């Protein structure tokens, strides 16, 4: 008689989630057989990719199919009280040092975001907006941050203080990130550590359940394994932990916070209060359509489907065609979010999408489809998120008409983000309530 059996192995830890089949082929399985059993074949070593082992026992031939079940890894719950899921970036409040944005966000307006269904803020800050050249606090910025953090504590909202942009070194008029890692410029490294030492000392008085830190926005040291950044990151974390050991700290993935670099993230041994944070704007030609570095492209874009659908556009803009003559859809986004979540789980860490967005230059139907697929994928994989630009920007869902200074809410997008359904009239009432002019 020949009987078919199945042997299933549970794997509790697997690395390189992008290519699980490659990993499984490199895990040897060796069998110890009881008396009377004999392997039919020339090998006694197998892998976990569906191979079959045939045994002989007396007159019986037994065939076993070898399969692997990758068990989910429970993320260690070190963030029991820092509870966050859906958030907004206060994108220009304390960034862009050449402009004075400090009056743009006021205490009166903070409750609006909670009413719209959000539970946290990411607060990008530029060094030159909150410090002077001697690293003394800008008093107005310091006071506003304390005021804001206190409001979050009193209203059960969370805030992530993000060091968004560093200032240039002395003698230079431009910040160059590579100088952070260059031994010729030790002052850059020392400056970065000093900034976080001062920030930690200043804001350690605020609740660990409500206020968190994010080390740096979109680092990109250009090493394959992010080794330059990892060394500096540990130095900064050591400085923070010497002052505030229990603060939740968001550690950015390398490569402009590419989710593919999550698996390289490093932190101090035994530090439970770490979240790995990434950004997601793929495909870039769609998300940044007619904006910033992609503004020269004037052809068509498409979502879902082939991002650059026209062959004529591909011929006219070959530098974009290489990455955008491909199909992008809900399955691709779901796969990327699944990978990000799995890579975090492999390190027993929560992951967070700190920025995502799509240009308002994109057709509304396509833009909403992209947002819908993004939010569904992040929610399905347990990834908390913070949309880029809450208010009046190229990505925002609250827009200002520059002709008359009136504001409006994209109610379709808001419903995708938070599930809150508003009529146009209700949206106008909320804006008016918080001091925004409406038509």
Task: Describe each model-derived feature in a short phrase.
Residues 186, 190-323, 327, 338-359, ...:
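Active-site region of glycoside hydrolase catalytic domains
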Residues 362-439:
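Aromatic-rich peripheral "rim/lid" segments of glycoside hydrolase catalytic domains that contact
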Residues 79-248, 253-263, 416-429, 434:
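Active-site mouth of glycoside hydrolases
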Residues 140, 177-180, 266-270, 293-295, ...:
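Short, hinge-like loop/turn segments at secondary-structure boundaries
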Residues 1-72:
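Beta-rich interaction/scaffold domains
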Residues 4-9, 96-108, 291-296:
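Short, polar loop/linker segments at the starts of domains and inter-domain junctions
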Residues 332-333:
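Alpha-helical scaffold elements lining the catalytic groove of polysaccharide deacetylases
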């Amino acid at each position: 008689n020949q009987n078919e059996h199945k042997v299933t192995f549970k794997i509790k830890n697997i690395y390189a989630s992008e290519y699980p089949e490659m990993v499984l082929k490199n895990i040897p399985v060796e069998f110890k057989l009881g008396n009377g059993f004999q392997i039919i074949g020339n090998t006694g070593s197998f892998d976990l990719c569906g191979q079959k082992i045939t045994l002989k026992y007396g007159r019986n031939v037994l065939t076993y199919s070898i399969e692997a079940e990758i068990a989910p890894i429970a993320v260690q719950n070190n963030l029991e009280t820092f509870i966050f899921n859906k958030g907004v970036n206060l994108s220009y409040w304390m960034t862009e040092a050449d402009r004075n944005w400090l009056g743009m966000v006021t205490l009166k307006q903070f409750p609006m975001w909670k009413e719209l269904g959000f539970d946290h803020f990411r607060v990008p800050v530029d060094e030159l907006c909150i410090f002077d050249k001697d690293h003394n606090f800008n008093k107005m910025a310091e006071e506003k941050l304390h005021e804001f953090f206190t409001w979050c504590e009193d209203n059960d909202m969370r805030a992530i203080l993000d060091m968004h942009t560093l200032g240039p070194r002395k003698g230079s008029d431009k910040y160059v990130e590579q100088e952070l890692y260059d031994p010729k410029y030790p002052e850059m490294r020392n400056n970065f550590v000093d900034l976080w030492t001062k920030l930690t000392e200043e804001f350690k008085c605020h609740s660990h359940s409500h206020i968190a830190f994010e080390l740096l926005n979109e680092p990109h040291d250009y090493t394959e394994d992010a080794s330059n950044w990892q060394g500096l990151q540990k130095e900064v974390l050591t400085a923070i932990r010497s002052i505030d050991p229990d603060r939740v700290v968001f550690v950015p993935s390398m490569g402009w916070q590419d989710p593919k670099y999550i698996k390289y993230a490093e932190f101090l041994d035994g530090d439970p209060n770490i979240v790995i944070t990434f950004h997601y704007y793929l495909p870039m030609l769609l998300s940044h359509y007619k904006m910033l570095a992609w503004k020269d492209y004037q052809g068509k874009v498409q979502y879902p489907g082939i991002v650059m659908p026209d062959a004529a556009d591909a011929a006219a803009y070959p530098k974009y065609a290489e990455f955008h003559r491909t199909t992008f859809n809900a399955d691709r986004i779901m796969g990327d979010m699944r990978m990000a979540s799995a890579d975090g789980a492999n390190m027993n860490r929560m992951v967070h999408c700190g920025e995502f967005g799509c240009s308002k230059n994109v057709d509304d139907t396509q833009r909403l489809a992209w947002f819908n697929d993004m939010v569904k994928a992040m929610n399905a994989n347990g990834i908390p998120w913070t949309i880029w630009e809450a208010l009046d920007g190229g990505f925002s869902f609250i827009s200002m008409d520059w002709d008359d200074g009136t504001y409006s809410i994209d109610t379709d997008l808001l419903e995708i983000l938070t599930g809150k359904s508003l009529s146009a009239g209700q949206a106008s009432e909320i804006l008016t309530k918080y001091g925004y002019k409406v038509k």
